Amino acid sequence: MFSGKYLVDLSLKPRLKSGVNYSLIKENLSDTAVIYVGNGVRGLKVRTDSLASDISGLPSLQLFLSTLQALKGHTSLATISEQINCSHEFISEVICQLLHHQLIDMHGSTLKFNNRIIEHYSSNQNLSSDDKSDGASQSLMARIKPELEITTWYENSLDGGVEKVYSRIDFPILIVGLSRIAIATAAILQASGFQSIQISSRAPEENPDKPITFEDISGGYIRPSDCGIGKQRVVSDMNAQISLFPISKDYSSNRTIPSSIQRFKPRLVISIGWPSADKFQEWMSSDISFLIVEEFINRSISIGPLVQPGKSACINCVHLAREERDPFLNHVVELRRFLPEREVPAAVSSFIAGLISLDVIAFADLGQSAFSNVQKIFSLDSLDSPQNFHWGLHPECQCHAV
């Protein structure tokens, strides 16, 4: 499996990705020893006969095992080579194979956090003694680690996924709607690293800072003590309470405050409920992507499409396509949007908020969405197999010219 010559910077201090383990195993019906490196989903098998003996005279399988044991993120490859007495070529071959199977991180990342620089390598081993005693640093390190379980497995992620999580600071999101789903989604996104989150009402006549009531309590962020407090204020207070990257109140200047917060312009809108014609037109003309979450009715809820103006099907494209397929059904669906807004059960609120948040993370990190040109209807009777409706740019719609 290991062959050819590789060039690797031996000053690097790589480490195996989170969740990657290794084990020496004997294959059935043979005495061939195998080292497996991986996590059960992806992995690498190395047999005794797949590695040429190294210059040290030790079996190459043992050298491979020794190399794996040394990949902890704080020892350079050159030092590892000296410690286990193997050639630079051997070390390079091992690293390149681990890179090929995306099982290794090659370097750490630097986070600029509340006027401080924090070195991070998906563990707190890199922290200085001062940082380790800093409560804010400890909190950040403890809370960012679970978030990296998503980003470290992105293709070509070499820093444990830290930079992807950190870049969410500059991805402002507007949530339209004041429902349980809206509040739960805002809380999850704040805890996932999105620093700039705002909510607004769906209708102009609705108070955007509508007070919290007992109906809003659904097992998430909202507590009985929040009743009577405006919903916009509650979402704003989330930054200090649960945000992964809270904004310090001690900023001496706006230089360290992300531009997305100094002047709020959303890069994505999440519309909980069908948007008004005015809001739809505003987002289209401003080239702002938006995701639609429809009403919960008959034990079902619809998510999508995620509209990227001029690039994917808009809600008018969907309307025109529905009109062609079934005018009567299209009329019924349109009328349903004029019904009074109703709250969803607590379990549905948490499920939908989590589902939306995972898709928003993928969209912010990678520019990908499971709801682009797609509407998914989730029924409580078959959550494992939602109905999928695929839409495309309609030839009679003018959104292509946006």
Put a short name on every predicted segment.
Residues 1-402:
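Adenine nucleotide-associated cytosolic modules
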